[in-house]
């Protein structure tokens, strides 16, 4: 008998265990958090560094398990191998990587409000229309002492706008700074336009 792969072993376990999670339809239920601890352990046993998110669609009564590399590009192959090997699980949708949440997105992070329509980026060294690109994300209220907050909020916005994989593969360098009073020949775009900006560059490459 052929030995099962680590991916198959994971899905064999999850196929049975998922029924316990499916019985709790309220994602805020304290019982659910306790049920997710074994899932975290089994996922880390498969590949340390992988994380997951759970979603639930009340209309279709379907759960979603998102397997994520948490932005670590080196772990992308492990995510893809695991999700590709997934067998159908009743009431569950299995997804690789955090997906885009739409063109417009707002978050509150460490006391700051981040709105993709009101945050702007400047492409850096973009003359050759290649991908990945470097971007400078600028804020009128940027303060250097709060740099980590601005960086954290920026990455959360990018993850929501582009999805995990696109953020890592299509953006080579990301910096945050104060928006200058005059921009000269620089072109500003709102972060809400970033995905379409990247898509247009990819079409030029093709």
What are these regions (language model features)?
Residues 1-62, 71-206:
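Long, contiguous binding/interaction regions
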């Amino acid at each position: 008998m052929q030995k099962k792969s680590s991916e198959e072993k994971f899905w064999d376990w999850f196929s049975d265990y998922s029924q316990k999670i499916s019985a709790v339809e309220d994602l805020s239920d304290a019982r659910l958090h306790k049920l997710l601890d074994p899932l975290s352990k089994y996922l880390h046993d498969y590949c340390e560094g992988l994380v997951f998110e759970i979603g639930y669609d009340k209309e279709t009564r379907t759960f979603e398990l998102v397997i994520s590399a948490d932005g670590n590009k080196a772990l992308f192959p492990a995510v893809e191998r695991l999700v590709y090997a997934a067998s159908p699980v009743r009431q569950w949708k299995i997804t690789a990587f955090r997906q885009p949440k739409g063109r417009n997105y707002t978050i509150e992070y460490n006391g700051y409000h981040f709105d993709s329509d009101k945050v702007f980026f400047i492409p850096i060294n973009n003359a050759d229309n290649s991908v990945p690109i470097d971007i400078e994300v600028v804020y009128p209220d940027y303060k250097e002492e709060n740099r980590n907050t601005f960086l954290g909020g920026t990455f959360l916005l990018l993850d929501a706008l582009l999805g995990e994989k696109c953020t890592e593969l299509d953006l080579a360098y990301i910096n945050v700074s104060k928006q200058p009073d005059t921009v000269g020949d620089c072109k500003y775009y709102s972060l809400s336009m970033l995905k379409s900006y990247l898509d247009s560059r990819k079409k030029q490459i093709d």
